[in-house]
A protein has these predicted regions:
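Formylglycine-dependent sulfatase
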Residues: 2, 6, 20-267
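Bacterial N-terminal signal peptides
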Residues: 7-18
Length: 267
């Protein structure tokens, strides 16, 4: 995994609802998080120098701020842990990427942003890639989130069972294979919605985005402020694009995927 400064640009936007006094006092918070995306891969920074544009992402920069200095963690798990826990990963042990079957994950004693915002009356949801633990005890819904719908690892780990070299022994897969896409709730309900196959990778970000929008709408209807952490799987290898985006830029898979991601941000 590349260093975090090349892995995840964080797009943070506060959406202010005006329907109630509580929403006016407490802003809705939506964090949009990409994967394996360098600062120079958005046209807000490269000014079109990479041969494609990301107008929806750029609009957030235009209405907010562009960061010119940054400190980054060395891996996906470490960076996500630093953000959601507010601690240096060496304190929590979340320094390397978590793999299927590992006991590594968010420790019980470490509060998350979700924990703190729930105390302030927020509805808390996490959608998309998590990578902060494989076991039920590590799921976001056991660490301050009302709802989680997402995958637990990087994409190349998800598609390993489809490769020719992956062990075919069912016992091996049960012990060490990746879990499917998980949908869980704070009341303890956990549903495995099936594997994140190569085919599902093409549209899974749309699944996650749809669930996130549904969650936000429900919070607004309930007159509750929300905190949503939306984690796209783009652009981690291996990236499987929707057919309509393949070749859309004419300059390669990565640019095509950035256009797809930008459209999802705009939706």
């Amino acid at each position: 995994m590349k260093k975090m400064m090349y892995t995840i640009p964080v797009i943070l936007t506060c959406l202010f609802a005006t329907s109630t006094a509580i929403a006016a006092a407490k802003p809705n918070i939506l964090v949009l998080w990409g994967d394996d995306i360098g600062v120079w891969n958005t046209s807000a920074y490269n000014r079109g120098g990479m041969g494609y544009k990301t107008p929806n992402i750029d609009s957030i920069a235009d209405e907010g701020a562009l960061f010119t200095d940054m400190y980054a963690q060395q891996s996906c798990t470490a960076g996500r842990a630093a953000f959601i826990l507010g601690q240096q990963p060496f304190r929590t042990g979340l320094l390397t990427i978590g793999m299927p079957g590992s006991d590594q994950g968010i420790p019980d004693w470490a509060p998350t942003i979700g924990d703190l915002l729930k105390e302030q009356g927020y509805a808390t949801g996490q959608f998309g890639k998590n990578h902060l633990g494989d076991q039920d005890k590590h799921l976001p819904t056991n660490h301050g989130f009302d709802e989680f719908f997402g995958n637990l690892y990087h994409l190349n780990a998800e598609e390993e069972p489809e490769t020719y070299y992956y062990p075919k022994d069912p016992a091996f897969h049960k012990e060490f294979g990746p879990r499917g896409v998980i949908h869980s709730y704070a009341d303890g309900k956990i549903e495995d919605t099936g594997p994140l196959s190569r085919k599902r990778m093409e549209t899974v970000d749309s699944e996650f985005g749809g669930a996130a929008k549904k969650f936000m709408a429900a919070a607004v209807n309930a007159d509750k402020p929300f905190f949503v952490w939306m984690n796209f799987t783009r652009m981690h290898v291996w990236t499987r694009l929707q057919e309509k985006y393949r070749g859309i830029t004419g300059i390669g898979l990565y640019p095509d995927g950035m256009v797809e991601l930008d459209d999802m941000v705009g939706s």
